[in-house]
Amino acid sequence: MNTSRKEFLGALSLATAFAGCTTAGVKGGAGAPDIRPTRFPPITFDGLEPKPDFWQVRPSEIMALCERATKCSKKEVICHTPLGYPVWALFYGDFSEPAPQTNWSAGNGSTTYHNYYGNRTDGKQTFLFIAGIHGAEPECVAGAMNFIQLMETGRDFRGKADPKLLELASKYRVIVVPCVNMDGRAISPDHLRGLDWINFRRASQGYWKDGSLVGWRGSKAWFPLPLDKVGYPGGYPNSEGYNIMHDACPGDLRTEEAKALLKLAARWRVDAVLNGHSYESAPSVIRGTSIAVPENVQRSKEIRYECNCALHEAGILPQPTPTPDKDKYSPGININNLLALASGALTLTLENTVSYDRPDKPSANIRPTRKYEFTELVDVTMIVLKAYLANGLKRPFVYRGSEKVYGD
């Protein structure tokens, strides 16, 4: 037997080890609402090369893979978007335990953390990977789809086996939400690879009726974006103009997508989250937030460092990454903060890249990027998943001990 065949059979055996059942429980399939037409037609650009077959990012492709997945122990439609698209979550591992008897907030103040976490005997942590909160950013959606295909068949859509990633994932309970903002994905191109900066912004955050850019910062001046004033809203928000990443004000949640993610994390006691996005620079895991469980703030610096070192060693991230003792944190507030408060999870954001050439802007700390190949953009997700999951085996992401850490 040749080496490649041995690797494939080994990977396949690990992939089939996740399920332990032949049929996945499906929630939310029957009686689903019809998918309505988009208010704005999809934006198009001349000169974008056709996507390769392994770049599965269209809503129809996302739905098809989730519907045919069988190696997952369960799968759910956690909500429907305003247009009626299903938002799927696929579960790999044992998710048979009852709901928590309390929530994270109350459990954190009770006599033992086990009142929330329960008394699981397998010791496996729960890892949540979400992608496509911004629908115009397909790179991590492509990564998530290839990861699901790997978990299902032992090879991703490129035909590539990754026994190490499968081995690491088998030591966790894994939940994958391949695309949160299906509405934004429905009006966005398959990719923006090689597109110039102006058109990248047009596709992402949209433009006003006079043709001027809404802009990255500008898009956050509105919640929701006033759709009656735009020529095109971009794939950043959902079809009602809401930026799901910033639907993060307790007591005033506006989107079903954000509510569903928070319920998902709370229900399954998620330990760690990877939130997949894209930006203009070389791919990296960006700074974690300062508004989180204090222990998680420092820990996120350590994991960020290891993930970015892995990207650097793979030749994807060209510049050194700060060591944890010199790293800073972000004062920003977004759904990662609420995910942390929903289950005590450690949360980090991966920024893949749209991969276009732009001039260096030292004053803005923006690095020029090279034009990454499609396969490299998928590799980014796989590399970061491996580094993140490997770190959690050295030390649990969050404290789950029976005794209290503070107070009496």
Stretches found by the model and what they are:
Residues M1-T16:
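N-terminal secretory signal peptides and thylakoid transit peptides that target proteins
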Residues T3, A24-Q56, R158, E240-D408:
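C-terminal accessory segments enriched in acidic
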Residues G31-W104:
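Short glycine- and acidic-rich boundary segments immediately preceding or forming the N-terminal edge
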Residues W88-A89, T112-G118, I335-L341:
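Short, surface-exposed beta-strand/loop micro-motifs that present aromatic residues
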Residues S96-P100, Y117-Q125:
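Proline/glycine-enriched tight loop/beta-turn segments at coil->beta junctions
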Residues K124, P138-V293:
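Active-site/substrate-binding loop(s) of hydrolase catalytic cores
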Residues F129-A136, C140:
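Active-site histidine-acidic residue metal-binding/catalytic motifs
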